[in-house]
């Protein structure tokens, strides 16, 4: 079965590298990552080295596929290694480059699996979702992290927000493809500008995920339109402003004591550590949460860049562990406006 499915996906990895973007990344990331950049670069510019994880849908479990994956040497992301690791979430990885085709959307039929970069699961795990909680996925399209959240627990309410209308349609289709009707009833999809969410729904959610718009390194490196790519690079400096505004809006939407996870799929310090440092510096009611235990737990499957921010992690790809880039930071909204103790997360 797996061989047949894999054959259908061959030929999809032929991509054309965008020199404009690569030159910019070479200039920036050689400074920010130092010697690590050459290793990361080798993976990012070589799609044949990329790996894809297979997240099972617990609402239509693929038992036959699971047997086939075991025979091919796939293994699960370390289940039970974290105190809050959800037993209901099952994701398989291969240590060698391999890709199955995505399943087609069929109205009324649930898909059995979702393909994703395995590092995308880390923000979901960091959120520590529990049954009955009110959850906001602020920038939810295309829906992979929303699907992953629903593999972890049964929220009392899940708001999946996506401001971009075409991406919002993609999000709705993804949810319809993976989530059964009874659970769909506790999910709402909105198209609000994420910067306005805090004012629209103040102090509403127990958990908020901000998977922010960013300079998606993998995607940008293979931009087909060089002029559009050059424009993106020029406009890139504006992204941190948007990202900070999204995080501040998400904080407003959090209940006191609520948790926020911020994530991007870029290596950019300006869009990662600097965003979190700006938020922590400007808001005394936000407490950084130590997530260094995630790096220790998942070091066999992921490579993490060195950091002095214990509230954040940066997954960097290397051969055999071609996951990422993925930046994750975790914050907690205080119960009052008293001055926070900044022992966990130092502004960079």
Swiss-Prot record:
InterPro entries: MeTrfase_RsmB-F_NOP2_cat, MeTrfase_RsmB-F_NOP2_dom, RCMT, SAM-dependent_MTases_sf
Record Pfam families: Methyltr_RsmB-F (PF01189)
GO biological process: regulation of mitochondrial translation; tRNA wobble base cytosine methylation
Residues given in the record as S-adenosyl-L-methionine binding sites: 139-145, 162, 193, 211
Reactions catalysed: cytidine(34) in mitochondrial tRNA + S-adenosyl-L-methionine = 5-methylcytidine(34) in mitochondrial tRNA + S-adenosyl-L-homocysteine + H(+)
Record key words, sorted: Methyltransferase, Mitochondrion, RNA-binding, S-adenosyl-L-methionine, Transferase, tRNA-binding
Subcellular location: Mitochondrion matrix
CDD domains on file: AdoMet_MTases
Primary localisation category: mitochondrion
PROSITE patterns to which the protein is assigned, alphabetical: SAM_MT_RSMB_NOP (PS51686)
Molecular function per GO: tRNA (cytidine-5-)-methyltransferase activity; tRNA binding
Catalytic activity, EC: 2.1.1.-
Residues annotated as catalytic: 265 (nucleophile)
SUPFAM superfamilies hit by this protein: S-adenosyl-L-methionine-dependent methyltransferases
Superkingdom of the organism of origin: Eukaryota
Gene Ontology cellular-component annotations: mitochondrial matrix; mitochondrion
Stated family: Belongs to the class I-like SAM-binding methyltransferase superfamily. RsmB/NOP family.
PANTHER family: NCL1 YEAST -RELATED NOL1/NOP2/FMU SUN DOMAIN-CONTAINING, TRNA (CYTOSINE(34)-C(5))-METHYLTRANSFERASE, MITOCHONDRIAL
Described function: Mitochondrial tRNA methyltransferase that mediates methylation of cytosine to 5-methylcytosine (m5C) at position 34 of mt-tRNA(Met). mt-tRNA(Met) methylation at cytosine(34) takes place at the wobble position of the anticodon and initiates the formation of 5-formylcytosine (f(5)c) at this position. mt-tRNA(Met) containing the f(5)c modification at the wobble position enables recognition of the AUA codon in addition to the AUG codon, expanding codon recognition in mitochondrial translation.
Name of the protein in question: tRNA (cytosine(34)-C(5))-methyltransferase, mitochondrial
